[in-house]
Amino acid sequence: MASAEETFFSAARSRRLACDRCHRHKLRCERSSVIVNGGVAVPLGPCKRCLKACIPCQTVQTISGAFTAAKTGDTPVPRRSAREADQAASPAKRAPSPARRPTASTPRNVPGLIHDDTLSGTDTAPFEISVADAAMLDVSNFDFSGSEFIDLGSNGVLSSPTPIQSPPDHGSLIRDSEIRDRTPIPPHNQPPPRYDDFANDLSCFGTMAPKDDTISTLPALTDVEKASTGSSKSAPERGPREECSQRLLEIHGLLLNELQCITPADVTDALMFPENGSFSGRTRTGQGPGNTVVHRVLFTSERLIELLSIIRAADTAINGDKREAGIGPRNTSSFVDLPIVISILTCYVGLLSVYHAIFSHIYEALRVYEPLRAAKIRQRAWTRRGSVPGPKPGPGLVQPRAIYGADEAGGRPALNVLGIRIQLEIMTHMLEQIDSALFGPRVAHGADGDEGRTDTINRGGEVMFGHPATKALLATMLSHEGYDSGVPVGPFADGDGDDDDDDGYMEGMRGCRMGFRTLMGLQKNIRRLLRTNSFG
């Protein structure tokens, strides 16, 4: 048996044995293995590159010194004699070209890439081969159909190639009658077109070659056209109504997701004892507006003020009716007249409820804290050395334990009074900003009284929600939530102290501001507790 060196040629010799097409384009010919028998090199089968391009593999070039013997000292055998070459060149004795396989299921089937004549049947010299070599030489044992392509998306399983899809309909550019058959059959008795530059061979890139210049095609876009197309497809600038809808969606999401549930532990973490860590079991992620309940409510308040500013700017730009014309539908055929004003009032009432819950938790925590602190001082006096006789702590003595984050010893840590005052002032200022954006700025009285009152009434009539139906709706919503338009009672009895805050406003504005009045009364009660009691 011949050795491996005698069986396979080197890379240099394989290039000399390449087919005409691979030799001309300087490609590595993917022909089958080569058998050396008696100094004759026998190629097995055509080149796979030619088969993929549906081109007959041709080897009609005269290669000098291509066939070398396996043993040193043998002379190269000529490929064929001159007489055989003359017989092969004659048209009468030329062998028929091999039949083309109907492999029209891949975009590499591009006709017209044949440059030379077909391979003659007398190109091979007589030689002797074994039975095993004859089986390898039988072309019927090899399948060069489309099933040899591997579908990469199916984990390497052999599958049939995807058929060629029909070209898209471009309207007036290509009519149905102009869509021709793409079967790669060259015209009869016409030489196929030649491609001098191999880079133009579209079969190597998996795309379809142009069939005819008469068919209209879509021109490729330049960089300038692509840039202009991208800019034209960009989203148009949003108007006041779109901005208003976006803000409303954000505020509703914050109220229903972040501020729907507020527990005393949340207020404790945010205001009462921030230096002692978290006393609640709620897990918090990240920093920023959503860190504590106070941060979240301030963030929502800023969004509501921005929304009211957008509406005020839209109403100011429109002359005539003082109603909510700026956020109305610009075109009834494309915009639905949604109750945006009612949604804004709903956000306002919901935000007032959040502030009321926070202020109520602070007020109740300060009221409960003082008795527990006094009990803790008395307990320390009982257990101190040298103190007067008194009851000793035992099983029957209830240890004073706070309802808001008590420590292990049963006592209460010192309150962060400065932090409570600062956060309370910030929330109060935010409420005043919302009230001013919704109902207009408040004007102080003049020296004579009448002039200042007239100025206030005029400003009250210019507010964006100054329509009587809107004010009546807001007053009804506040009453439904439990706010009272009169002087508050109970823990808020001392509220504003007098009724001067409403002087200068129209009578209808009194019911609209009863939620703000209630919160201001509760805020003053918290200030009184912080001022009169010693929390330390």
Curated annotation (Swiss-Prot):
GO CC list: nucleus
Domain of life: Eukaryota
Low complexity compositional bias, start-end: 88-108
PROSITE patterns in the record: ZN2_CY6_FUNGAL_2
Null mutant phenotype: Drastically reduces the transcription of chaetoglobosin A biosynthetic genes and completely abolishes chaetoglobosin A production. Abolishes sporuration.
GO MF annotations, alphabetized: DNA binding; DNA-binding transcription factor activity, RNA polymerase II-specific; zinc ion binding
Compartment(s) where it occurs, according to its Swiss-Prot or TrEMBL record: Nucleus
Function: Transcription factor; part of the gene cluster that mediates the biosynthesis of chaetoglobosin A which has a unique inhibitory activity against actin polymerization in mammalian cells. Chaetoglobosin A and its intermediates are involved in the morphological differentiation of C.globosum. Binds directly to asymmetric direct repeats present in the promoters of the chaetoglobosin A cluster genes.
Protein name: Transcription factor cheR
Organism: Chaetomium globosum (strain ATCC 6205 / CBS 148.51 / DSM 1962 / NBRC 6347 / NRRL 1970)
Gene name per UniProt: cheR
